[in-house]
From Swiss-Prot:
Post-translational modification Phosphoserine, affected residues: 341, 348-349
Identification of the protein by name: Ceramide synthase 2
GO biological process, one term: ceramide biosynthetic process
Self-association and partners: Interacts with ATP6V0C, ASGR1, ASGR2 and SLC22A1/OCT1. Interacts with ELOV1, HSD17B12 and TECR. Interacts with NDUFS2.
Keyword Ligase assigned: no
Catalytic activity: a very long-chain fatty acyl-CoA + a sphingoid base = an N-(very-long-chain fatty acyl)-sphingoid base + CoA + H(+); docosanoyl-CoA + sphinganine = N-docosanoylsphinganine + CoA + H(+); tetracosanoyl-CoA + sphinganine = N-tetracosanoylsphinganine + CoA + H(+); hexacosanoyl-CoA + sphinganine = N-hexacosanoylsphinganine + CoA + H(+)
Chain positions covered by the region annotation Homeobox-like: 67-128
CDD domains (UniProt xref): homeodomain
Cytoplasmic side: 325-380
Length: 380
């Protein structure tokens, strides 16, 4: 049965155009072709990426955070309370009013004290500013290097300037070492992101991020199997062109350099819109949808590849919506922040006031303490 499944999965009609077989893609005469077995190396490379990331965050990102004066807000910890902790872990982090009243009776605390306990407990679970900075630093470093390397891989190729040449001679297209390593490194990195997603900073688009990583891994793997390598290198470089800008904007945001963050974010938004909503659908997708049909009839691989490209395009539209919302806030003078991030709650949430007298009563609050001077912003 397993052999039958294996034979059906690797049936040439699924992966290759009509009248072509895997034998046509065997290495010969010094020409090397993409093979599925090449991708086995990406899993150990993904683990290597996780190790490199650990040491990078420890010995590079952490000192950089100190240099940029990335500071944590003081968080008041929720006092131990078995009753409230049990509810928090088993029933939910946001108790309804009826739950608050019940927990108040069970714990002997007032309703206001129960609400305060849950706010502090939720804040404890939120990732620290340093964790966010280190994660953004790692991704910025990879995406920047990947974009530079990817550009070097494709800039001297004829299909970079004439998309019809992407399919010239397809699928009998040999690969060169630079294409091989570009693919292996990109795929390994996305495997590492998928492996670490449970421990990384969780944002509101957590599910969309999982879909994106899975779709990207499938697309990169399939494009290698089916020898869509030329199209694949163009797509990967296009995606890397804006990602490093977003991560650098996050880094400056966490460091408190708001003007620099906002300026980089505007550049990122422009690059994202141009690459993901203009170049990708009207050039790259047109290239993968229209030009192949001029050479051979559509087959399963053709439909599958373009379907996955459509999934990515829908995610781009979703993220473009979030980006435009943030850009609108910037233009209208509001603070620009990551729309996907949860906001940290303060002790004054839901109208609660700190127990402080005199003029401090009406001052801004941070974790329940009046802020004496809230104007320490870096001047870029």
């Amino acid at each position: 049965m397993l052999q039958t499944l294996h034979d059906y999965f690797w049936w040439e009609r699924l992966w290759l155009p009509v009248n072509l077989t895997w034998a046509d893609l065997e290495d010969r005469d010094g020409r090397v072709y993409a093979k599925a077995s090449d991708l086995y190396i990406t899993l150990p490379l993904a683990l290597l990426f996780l190790i490199i990331r650990y040491f990078f965050e420890l010995y590079v990102a952490t000192p950089l955070a100190a240099l940029l004066n990335v500071k944590e807000k003081t968080r008041l910890r929720a006092p131990p309370n078995p009753t409230l902790e049990h509810f928090y872990m088993t029933s939910g982090k946001q108790p309804k009013q009826a739950d608050v009243e019940l927990l108040s009776r069970q714990s002997g605390l007032s309703g206001r004290q129960v609400e305060r306990w849950f706010r502090r407990r939720r804040n404890q679970d939120r990732p620290s500013l340093l964790k966010k900075f280190r994660e953004a630093s790692w991704r910025f470093t990879f995406y920047l290097i990947a974009f530079i390397a990817g550009t070097a891989v494709i800039v001297d190729k004829p299909w970079f300037y004439d998309l019809r040449k992407v399919w010239e001679g397809y699928p009998i297209q040999s690969i060169i070492p630079s294409q091989y390593w570009y693919y292996m490194i990109e795929l390994s990195f996305y495997w590492s992101l998928l492996f670490s997603i449970a421990s990384d900073v969780k944002r509101k688009d957590f599910k969309e991020q999982i879909i994106h990583h899975v779709a990207t891994i499938i697309l990169i793997s399939f494009s290698w199997f089916a020898n869509y390598v030329r199209a694949g290198t163009l797509i990967m470089a296009l995606h890397d062109s804006s990602d490093y800008l977003l991560e650098s904007a996050k880094m400056f945001n966490y460091a408190g350099w708001k003007n620099t963050c906002n300026n980089i974010f505007i550049v990122f938004a422009i690059v994202f819109i141009i690459t993901r909503l203009v170049i990708l659908p009207f050039w790259i997708l047109h290239c993968t949808l229209v030009y192949p049909l001029e050479l051979y009839p559509a087959f399963f691989g053709y439909y599958f590849f373009n379907f996955m490209m459509g999934v990515l395009q829908l995610l781009h539209i979703f993220w473009a919506y979030l980006i435009l919302r943030m850009a609108h806030k910037f233009i209208t003078g509001k603070v620009v922040e990551d729309e996907r991030s949860d906001r940290e709650e303060t002790e004054s949430s839901e109208g609660e006031e700190a127990a402080a007298g005199g003029g401090a009563k009406n001052r801004p609050l941070a974790n329940g303490h009046p802020i004496l001077n809230n104007n320490h912003r870096k001047n870029d």
